[in-house]
């Protein structure tokens, strides 16, 4: 089935061509009410054992679906996701996302080994139809229905898997403002999901969901915020002290001295450096044998220091919007 919710002007026209060419294709034409609502409408007429979901701006490889289906032979597996790679690779932002998506995919595959794949991505994922229907379908109130349905599946003790060999290419934002909007939505949806399922924390020792997935995701949010606050506090104290201490300026004290860091071998600095080095090693391994190639340490350093530092911007904006209860822009 092809579902057109009028989110892309040309989608209906293209879908009709496919419907004319293939007898198995059926179009559901409806006004744009959000992806989750549209998927739920499609669920009402689907009677197959499995349902595959992909986005209009994504391009799965021909053998991707076949490579994913085999995972459902394992008992309890109710959703399988794919490896998402970047299709457009022209400007610097797009190239940074090439690295970003490769690392995300590699990290997600590692989580697969501990039954903790907590996102079945929108570009290409396959679900057991009966399970999704039993769970009430996709949550239309959540901005990231792919995250929410995955957590819902895990919360009832079922499994999710990732096929690293099943590849789908997606079109990523080429402009910074669009990148920020996308990541704000991701952060908002992630926070919504944590708030919805936090009561499962440390419940049912037989399920990894409450003992690993929730703490893992929640701690990632908290560490990012704490790191930002500590860094901001450092700059504020240093900046206020030196900028307003005229005696230092008159004596020739360097104006930007407050930006210098003290690299004394404190326990905090030691663990920070250790974490950074381990991250570089992780990224290096993530690029090995991937379609992005074996990236140089310099490129990984630039990615780690510059691009990853930008992550805090959409997170702060998401928290601000959440504090105002403003989710309207992202649900239009």
Annotate each language-model stretch with its function.
Residues 5-6, 63, 74, 163:
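Acidic/polar residues in short coil/turn loops that connect beta-strands
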Residues 222-241:
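Hydrophobic, aromatic-rich transmembrane alpha-helices
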């Amino acid at each position: 089935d092809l579902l057109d919710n009028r989110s892309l002007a040309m989608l209906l026209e293209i879908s009709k061509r496919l419907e004319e060419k293939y007898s198995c294709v059926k179009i559901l034409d409806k006004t744009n009410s959000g992806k989750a609502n549209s998927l739920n409408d499609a669920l009402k007429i689907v009677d197959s054992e499995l349902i595959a979901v992909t986005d209009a701006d994504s391009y799965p490889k021909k053998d991707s679906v076949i490579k994913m289906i085999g995972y459902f032979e394992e008992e309890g597996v109710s959703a399988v996701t794919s490896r998402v790679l970047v299709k457009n690779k022209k400007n610097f932002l797009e190239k940074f996302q090439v690295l970003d998506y490769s690392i995300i995919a590699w990290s997600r595959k590692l989580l697969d080994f501990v039954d903790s794949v907590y996102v079945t991505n929108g570009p290409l994922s396959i679900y057991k139809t009966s399970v999704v229907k039993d769970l009430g379908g996709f949550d239309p109130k959540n901005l990231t229905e792919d995250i929410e349905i995955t957590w819902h599946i895990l919360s009832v003790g079922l499994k999710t898997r990732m096929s690293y060999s099943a590849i789908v290419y997606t079109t990523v934002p080429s402009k910074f403002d669009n990148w920020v909007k996308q990541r704000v939505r991701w952060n908002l949806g992630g926070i919504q999901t944590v708030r919805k399922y936090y009561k499962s924390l440390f419940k049912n020792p037989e399920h990894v969901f409450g003992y690993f997935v929730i703490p893992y995701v929640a701690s990632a949010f908290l560490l990012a915020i704490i790191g930002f606050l500590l860094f901001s506090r450092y700059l504020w104290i240093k900046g206020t002290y030196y900028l307003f201490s005229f005696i230092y300026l008159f004596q020739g004290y360097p104006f930007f001295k407050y930006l210098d860091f003290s690299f004394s071998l404190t326990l905090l600095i030691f663990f920070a450096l250790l974490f950074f080095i381990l991250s570089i090693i992780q990224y290096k391994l993530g690029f090995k044998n991937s379609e992005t190639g074996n990236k140089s340490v310099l490129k990984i350093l630039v990615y780690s220091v510059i691009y990853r530092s930008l992550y805090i911007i959409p997170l702060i904006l998401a928290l601000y919007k959440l504090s105002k209860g403003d989710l309207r822009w992202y649900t239009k």
